[in-house]
Every structure is written in C-alpha cells, then in structure tokens.
Amino acid sequence: MNDDIELPVDVDLYKQWHIDLIQKHRAESNSNSILFAIENDNGEHVGVCNLYGIDERHGRFEPVGIEINVSHRNKGYGTAAFRMIGRYMFNERRMHKWNSGYVEGNNASAVMHKKLGFIVEGVRPDSIYHDGKYRGEVMCGITETQFFENEKTLPLLM
C-alpha cells in the first residue's frame, strides 16, 4: 500500500499543479507560513517548498515540507532550497532556531539534514503512518550560529 499523493507526470501539469497550490495557499494563508516554487538555473519548475510554523515571538520556525519532481531528485535541489530558506529565515526574518524532522528510513532527508549541520534531538516512535506502517519521526534542529558555521564548509551557493 502506498499512501503518497499521486502527482501529475507531465511536467507542464506538474508545474500548473504547484502554481494552483501556491495561489490557493496565498489566498488562505497568514504570515506564519510561506509556500514557494523551486526552479533550476534554466527556469524549469522542479518542485515546491512549504515553510510553516513561523514563531516570531520565540524566534523559531519549524517544519519545512519539500517536494521535488521525481525526475529532478538527487540533484541537490532540496539541499539548495533548504540552504536558501536558512539564509532567508536567519538573515531576513531574524530567527534563532530551525526545528525540522523527517520520517525514519528516509535516507535522502537524513543525509541532507546531516550535511546542513542539523543535530538529531530525538525520535518520536510510531508517529507517522507511511507506506502501510507506522514509522518514527526523527526530530532535529539547528541554531542560527550552527547554520552559518556549517555554511562555511559547503560549496558556494549562488
């Protein structure tokens, strides 16, 4: 059993689906969330990212949902998007802490979080029902200082 949402296969339909999603989000949204499209250097739509749980009072934000088109996965788009989110939220929105997480067994997400300097803070057992069974949710976080220290170790991002 696969509980994932079926996405359009056609690239133009995929892009339109995300445009519709973004427009719907803007119409219903408040300032506690941001939804944006991800494009490659050629202007081709490769995915969408949803940033929500922005807490101005405590200077933190949490989870970021990201969806990269299957044909564009494992090319660094998710990592680049996360880096841009960190720069924006820490520099422009003056946030202090980024709380994130991923489903146990999602190795791509685990590798990305580690590469970006996130620290695993714990696991919520059996918290997410995915692909026919309950899985743990790995909780991790990074502070502004940790994020920018780690950024120094990564290749330049334009």
Stretches with model-predicted labels:
Residues 21-37:
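A short helix-loop-beta-strand connector motif used in the catalytic cores of GNAT acetyltransferases and
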Residues 35, 39-158:
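Acyl-donor (CoA/ACP) binding surface of acyl/acetyltransferases
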Residues 1-22:
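Conserved GNAT-fold acetyl-CoA-binding loop/helix
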